Regions:
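Acidic-glycine-rich active-site phosphate/pyrophosphate-binding loop
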Residues: 113-123
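Alpha-helical structural segments
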Residues: 15-23, 27, 41, 58-81, ...
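Hydrophobic alpha-helical connector segments
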Residues: 72-103
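Helix-turn-helix
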Residues: 24-56
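Hydrophobic/aromatic-rich alpha-helical bundle segments in the mid-to-C-terminal region
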Residues: 121-186
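Basic, helix-initiating cap at the start of DNA-binding domains
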Residues: 1-28, 37
Length: 186
């Protein structure tokens, strides 16, 4: 019985921290937000915050991971598909709109997805792991930047941009692959 109460309190605390974070992200942005601001908004003390998170960056990383986990599952191994999944709810959109938070979103997408995507690029192109990783990072950063520019709004413009990016990526991989094949056969 006591464990259920503690778990309920913990869930409540994490919930008010999360709500305070997203409210402040919308109002002042990540760079200007402090742990003290989050605690004031959540009506908790700093000690309580630090029981759950090391700092505001750890909170941001946890919320980014939550947002990525809430997105529809990734089908296939195309980098474009990875970056076409819109945020699952309005709070998560804020992570993509804030300049400082967005940089960490892109970093986390790369960290969480490289293991799945880089071997696929290597197989398709014949590139080394290092070179395939460079292409993967380029594709993630570029796709996310274009989606951000378009406001993640679905529609004809978004669909056209995705088609263009996929054609560009696939054409580039074909060119690299054929270049690699011609060097191998020489």
């Amino acid at each position: 019985m006591e464990a259920g109460r503690i778990d309920r309190r913990r869930r409540y605390t994490l919930s008010v921290i999360r709500e305070a974070f997203f409210a402040l992200l919308a109002e002042v942005g990540f760079a200007k937000m402090t742990v003290a601001d989050i605690c004031r908004r959540a009506d908790i003390n700093r000690g309580t915050f630090y029981l759950h998170y090391e700092d505001k960056f750890a909170l941001l990383d946890a919320l980014i991971d939550e947002a990525l986990a809430a997105a529809p599952p990734l089908e296939g191994t195309e980098t474009g598909a990875l970056c076409q999944r819109p945020p699952a709810n309005d709070d998560y959109y804020l992570l993509y709109l804030d300049d400082d938070a967005y940089a960490r979103v892109a970093q986390r997408v790369v960290e969480r997805s490289a293991e799945q995507m880089v071997p696929s690029i290597m197989e398709e192109s014949g590139l080394s792991r290092e070179d395939a990783y460079l292409l993967f990072v380029h594709n993630v950063q570029g796709n996310l930047a274009v989606n951000r520019l378009l406001g993640w709004k679905r529609g004809p413009k978004f669909a056209h941009a995705q088609e263009l990016l996929v054609a560009y990526s696939e054409g580039g991989l074909r060119a690299i692959s054929s270049r690699h094949d011609s060097r191998s056969s020489s």
